[in-house]
A protein has these predicted regions:
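Short alpha-helical segments that sit at the start of domains
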Residues: 1-18, 39, 78
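Short, cationic-aromatic polyanion-contact patches
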Residues: 3-6, 60-82
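DNA-binding alpha-helical recognition surfaces that contact promoter or target DNA
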Residues: 14, 29, 45
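The C-terminal cap of the DNA-recognition helix in HTH/winged-HTH DNA-binding domains
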Residues: 18, 49-52
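Short acidic, hydrophobic short linear motifs in intrinsically disordered regions
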Residues: 22-31
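Short amphipathic alpha-helical interaction segments
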Residues: 36-49
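A short, conserved structural fragment
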Residues: 51-61
Length: 85
C-alpha cells in the first residue's frame, strides 16, 4: 500500500533525491501506483508542496514535468565557481 499525506510527500522527496531528474509517472511506477491521471496528479500535488518549501526545482519540458533536488543547483554553482579559479 502506498503512503499517504506527509508520508507520501517525504517518500516522493526521497525518490527525487535518489533518482533525479524524474517525473511524476516515474515516481508512480517506483511506489507501485497504477499509472492513471488521478495518481499522476496526486504526485504532482506533492511536487508542488516540495517546490513551495524550496526542497526541489521543477521544469516543464514539453508536456513532462521534471523534478530534481534543490541541493543540485547549489552544487552546480560551486562547480561553476571552481571552474573560474
Amino acid at each position: 500500500m502506498a503512503p499517504k499525506g506527509k508520508d507520501l510527500t517525504r517518500k516522493v522527496y526521497e525518490i527525487i533525491c535518489h533518482r533525479w531528474p524524474i517525473h511524476p509517472s516515474g515516481i508512480c511506477r517506483i511506489i507501485g501506483l497504477e499509472l492513471t491521471v488521478s495518481n499522476i496528479s496526486k504526485i504532482k500535488y506533492h511536487f508542488d508542496i516540495l517546490k513551495q518549501k524550496e526542497m526541489i526545482h521543477t521544469k516543464q519540458i514539453d508536456r513532462a514535468l521534471v523534478a530534481w533536488p534543490a541541493e543540485i543547483d547549489k552544487i552546480r554553482v560551486v562547480h561553476e565557481m571552481m571552474k573560474g579559479i
